Design a protein with these regions (language model features):
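Active-site beta-strand/loop signature of hydrolases that rely on acidic residues for catalysis
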Residues: 94-96, 126-146, 209, 221, ...
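Active-site-proximal beta-strand elements of phosphoester/diester hydrolases
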Residues: 88-101, 189, 218-228
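Metal-dependent phosphoester-hydrolase catalytic domains
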Residues: 9-77, 201, 253-265, 271-357
């Protein structure tokens, strides 16, 4: 009898130890995958939000005050009431190349070097040169970096009272948008599961906002930054970009179905050229009603390149803007590329702009 009690106590201790080992292993997996199911089960994370069907005009996440400033988010958008094309509204996109500042909360284990003051001034000079009303940013560090840039732009006479920065756990390079006009909807998602993947997610999420002008015009702006080409396994990186592009195409298809007729612009650093698979997936869409048109802006010399790739010693068109047919019919021209001398100091990418109507 005593012997059996001993073995029962031993087995209970052994089982408890095994349970603790498995629990710690599960927490470590979730720490690096971004999936917090186990944490929620333990009561250490907020309850999971139910996956909601997109409804035009309904934001599907709450925006912390330190990372977003919007107008009151609207529950519904009357697409039929959108005014006809009016005065042009300039949109500019720029990969600002590691715009990190001191004091920013670090989200990865990598060593980050703050961007120099001269380089940050150069970024502000480029944006001020184009005088946009809406700015899409790639590789901005976070809320502090965005505030730093907004202050430099304000010193140059450009005020952007509305903004959104999309932060992805484990990734220091964020997406952001600045706007002169109110952001009235937000469908941005930081944790987007990849197509045909159970746990793996897009590296930087999908930025997705709707901006309303004073005359009632609406523009839906979507931004993305696909997997870098700087990787040990180039084939794996290319495959990941394709998966991310397909996932983004699914997002765009949903927009096309739920808000048909709404002017849509998609900007991104695709880390692939126009003829490569990832940008073509985004442009062609998953159905005819979700197909986009690529703009072909040029600089003052008639050149289209947006990045000089030092490793391959080649000029690339990795930064691209797509628009849906509704918006393209309202526009005139292809836009341009800011090629002032400050461009070389600001980033390894050049800024693109286009005029929306």
């Amino acid at each position: 009898m005593h012997g059996s009690n001993f073995w029962m106590r031993y087995l209970r201790k052994d089982s408890l130890l095994l349970f603790l080992v498995l629990l710690v292993a599960g927490l470590l997996v979730e720490r690096f995958s971004g999936d917090d199911t186990l944490l929620r089960w333990l009561g250490a994370a907020p309850p999971a939000q139910q996956q909601q069907e997109y409804v035009p005009g309904v934001a599907n996440l709450e925006l912390p005050a330190e990372v977003a400033h919007t107008a009151p988010l609207q529950k519904q958008v009357d697409i039929a009431a959108i005014p006809r094309p009016g005065k042009p509204v300039r949109f500019l996109m720029h990969n600002v190349q590691n715009y990190f500042v001191e004091g920013e909360v670090q989200r990865s284990p990598y060593v980050l070097k703050p961007k120099t003051r001269n380089s940050r001034d150069a970024v502000a000079d480029i944006i001020a040169e184009a005088k946009p009303q809406i700015v899409g940013l790639i590789e901005i560090g976070g809320p502090l970096a965005l505030q730093d840039l907004r202050q430099r732009l304000a010193a140059r006479g450009l005020e952007f009272p509305y903004y959104r920065v999309l932060i992805r756990p484990g990734e220091d390079r964020a997406l952001a948008v600045l706007s002169v006009h109110p952001i009235v909807q937000d469908h941005s998602q930081s944790k987007v599961k990849l197509h045909q993947q159970k746990r793996r997610k897009m590296l930087r999420g999908i930025l997705d906002v709707t901006i309303r002008l004073d005359d009632g015009r609406l523009f839906r702006i979507v931004g993305a930054h696909l997997k870098s080409r700087v990787a040990e396994d180039a084939a794996a990186a290319s495959a990941l970009r394709k998966q991310e592009a397909y996932t983004l195409a699914q997002h765009i298809q949903h927009i096309a179905r739920m808000q048909k007729g709404l002017p849509l612009l998609v900007f991104g650093d695709w880390n692939d050229g126009p003829a490569d698979a990832a940008p073509r997936i985004v442009q062609q869409g998953l159905s005819q009603d979700a197909a986009l048109r690529r703009l072909s802006p040029e600089d003052s010399r008639g050149e289209e390149w947006t990045l000089y790739y030092k490793r391959g010693k080649e000029y690339c068109v990795y930064d691209q803007i797509f628009v849906n047919p509704v918006l393209r019919e309202r526009m005139r021209g292809q836009g341009g590329i800011v090629d002032i001398p400050a461009a070389a100091k600001a980033s390894d990418h050049r800024a693109l702009w286009c005029d929306l109507r």
